[in-house]
Amino acid sequence: MDENKKRALAAALGQIEKQFGKGSVMRMGDRVVEPVEAIPTGSLMLDIALGIGGLPKGRVVEIYGPESSGKTTLTLQAIAECQKMGGTAAFIDAEHALDPIYAAKLGVNVDDLLLSQPDTGEQALEIADMLVRSGSVDILVIDSVAALTPKAEIEGEMGDQLPGLQARLMSQALRKLTGNIKRSNTLVIFINQLRMKIGVMMPGQSPETTTGGNALKFYASVRLDIRRIGAIKKGDEIIGNQTKIKVVKNKLAPPFKQVITEILYGEGISREGELIDMGVDAKLVEKAGAWYSYGEERIGQGKDNARGYLRDNPTVAAKLEAELREKFQPAEAAREEGDDEGEDE
């Protein structure tokens, strides 16, 4: 760059700093690039698939899927992990459906959890913004986007047609929230529901879409698609769900990773079950018939007994986890038409 241009740039930067404050514009090389802080999800498999060890702080995350697929369970486990690290958590329950007893079973300290059950979508998002701006909340969950009902809809008649109202509300809120989220380094998780698109579909295109318009798809740094794919049985009794979690969008690491984990009723994501499955995949745990072995030790006949052994022997589980963090590679998920929808990269 010639001298005249350098002087002009220095003058412009000086004027910008004077008007907008120091650090308004900076050279990338002047600042040390620090790794993104992450909050673990409670699922070792998912933490590895996300590439940064969990969900990123200072970013927006969207978790969506069909009903009873484990969306709220996953967010409550992330809250529990955040509280274990000494963080403060807030839960905006727009669905008015949070069960504190279930949350406590998942490890959430419900006495310290900040809870809001707002009347309107505007109130929910305003409370979220105020909590984020306080800079003292580490993780904030909004459950769910579909339940953020605009004030005009609540005050109107049952049959009133108000097209695009919720989408406009989300778009406006996210424009306002994003900068504050980054500055306060808060992880904000939006839980979302699925709806079916009405009308003619292109071949190969998914008929499913999320509620609240396209704004959240653009602003989210991570999008997770969570689905129940089977039942876990103990004899004839169903004790949980087999769940597939797909990283549909990831701005911080390669996306399209996929994991299959277990969510047990009343317990949440089975850490021990994950260690066994991952250990078998990574050839650290040997499976011969119904028996599972780790090193020289037989750890159980059948998965349920092996799970119990790891639960009773935390040092063995910790050793296996440390080895798996180095070796385990999550599966690549098949890309679908709808996966790129709303991505800006």
From Swiss-Prot:
HAMAP family: RecA (MF_00268). GO terms for cellular component: cytosol. It is found in: Cytoplasm. The keyword DNA damage applies. Belongs to the RecA family. Keywords: ATP-binding, Cytoplasm, DNA damage, DNA recombination, DNA repair, DNA-binding, Nucleotide-binding, SOS response. Residues 326-336 have a biased composition (Basic and acidic residues). Can catalyze the hydrolysis of ATP in the presence of single-stranded DNA, the ATP-dependent uptake of single-stranded DNA by duplex DNA, and the ATP-dependent hybridization of homologous single-stranded DNAs. It interacts with LexA causing its activation and leading to its autocatalytic cleavage. InterPro entries: AAA+_ATPase, DNA_recomb/repair_RecA, DNA_recomb/repair_RecA_CS, P-loop_NTPase, RecA-like_C, RecA-like_N, RecA_ATP-bd, RecA_C_sf. Pfam families: RecA, RecA_C. The keyword Cytoplasm applies. It comes from the Bacteria. One of its GO terms (molecular function) is damaged DNA binding. Residues 326-345 are annotated as: Disordered. ATP binds at residues 65-72. GO terms for biological process: DNA recombination; DNA repair; SOS response. This is Protein RecA.
